[in-house]
Amino acid sequence: MKTSIINKLFAMAALCLVSSTISFAANPPLPAEQLPAKAQAFVQDNFERNSIVAVESTTDTYMCVLNDGTVIDFNKNGSWSNVDCNENSIPLNFVPRNLLQYVYGNYPCCTINKVNRGNQGYAVRLQTEEGKACTVNVRFLADLD
């Protein structure tokens, strides 16, 4: 009985290992130079102190990880769709002015550490001075490209 359970656990572990290997092979990491030029320029313009440590691609998106842990998602054309700086403040150069005015007008004691741009507008994750986080959804469609 114990041998049967151990054999089943071993078989499940082997299956997980094989499936994760296949999954990794389906989306191997790319060199940073294979990001679209627009995405490369975005990183250079807004994160000049950081370097790209990993790039993954699917059929219609790119995920870029920087050396400070920042994760940036781009669409297939190289336009950013998500920037997540974890606990750090995001650079504000690329955030639409009206979004910044709204956020800092309504949440003056917060910093933005994540911004997501979608078809319905923006979602931002804010962090208070005490370290608490909240998410705010804002509809500003004029600045989407």
How would you label these PLM feature ranges?
Residues K2-A11:
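Bacterial N-terminal signal peptides that target proteins for export
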Residues F10-T21:
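Bacterial N-terminal signal peptides
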